[in-house]
Amino acid sequence: MINLILLGLPGAGKGTASERIVDKYHLTHISTGDMFREAMANKTKVGLEAKSYIDKGNLVPDEVTARLVEERLSQPDIKEGYILDGFPRTTVQAELLEGITKRLKKPLTNVIALEVDEDTLIKRLSARYMCKNCGATYNKISKQPKVEGTCDRCGSHEFYQREDDKPEVVKNRLEVNEKMNAPLKDFYQKKGLLTIINGEQTPEKVFEDIDAVLSNNQ
């Protein structure tokens, strides 16, 4: 079984790598953003608690997020393993996750960090745009829709660029994320779980390197 966290700054290629990992290894992709939306829509106890913070414009406390993650990891669809997206973001959350995975007997097997030079990230992020309807992500450099002007996922013709993907905002965003990412990498390095992959390579080569690491777990 493979239980995985994929680390990397915005623009490092985590989304593309995640899709390929899920396709090959049939892991359950767990996104904290999706979990919050689902739990709030279903009005679960944790979902309503999270909503009370979000509605006031406050950050959801780590303990609430951790309960949501534990609830999701307890579901029966996680048979062949999971890939966590958006959690943990801090070492405090990493410690909470460690407790959860021990209780559920679903320990992490791998933490993979995609390393990309800051200049490359700025270039990639500034070229990123999204479908207004479904949120599918595209890139003017590396990932255009199959049919120009038409979203591959939903067929919409409306696209936009997020405010925080605009060049003037990107640099500051990367610095903030790196401050959060660096301690996490240290945390998992000490646990012997971390593998660093060169994210400057083509998506195919990045996945080839990830695949070489994960195939050792089977």
UniProtKB/Swiss-Prot annotation:
It is found in: Cytoplasm. HAMAP family: Adenylate_kinase_Adk (MF_00235). The lineage of its organism: Bacteria, Bacillati, Bacillota, Bacilli, Lactobacillales. Pfam families: ADK (PF00406), ADK_lid (PF05191). The gene is adk. AMP binds at T32, R37, N58, L59, V60, G86, F87, P88, R89, Q93, R162, R173. Pathway: Purine metabolism; AMP biosynthesis via salvage pathway; AMP from ADP: step 1/1. Consists of three domains, a large central CORE domain and two small peripheral domains, NMPbind and LID, which undergo movements during catalysis. The LID domain closes over the site of phosphoryl transfer upon ATP binding. Assembling and dissambling the active center during each catalytic cycle provides an effective means to prevent ATP hydrolysis. Some bacteria have evolved a zinc-coordinating structure that stabilizes the LID domain. ATP binds at G11, A12, G13, K14, G15, T16, R128, T137, Y138, Q201. One of its GO terms (molecular function) is zinc ion binding. Residues 127-165 are annotated as: LID. Zn(2+) binds at C131, C134, C151, C154. Keywords: ATP-binding, Cytoplasm, Kinase, Metal-binding, Nucleotide biosynthesis, Nucleotide-binding, Transferase, Zinc. It is an enzyme of class 2 (transferase). One of its GO terms (cellular component) is cytoplasm. Residues 31-60 are annotated as: NMP. It catalyses: AMP + ATP = 2 ADP. It comes from Lactobacillus acidophilus (strain ATCC 700396 / NCK56 / N2 / NCFM). This is Adenylate kinase. NCBIfam families: adk (TIGR01351), PRK00279.1-2 (NF001380), PRK00279.1-3 (NF001381). GO terms for biological process: AMP salvage. Its EC number is 2.7.4.3.
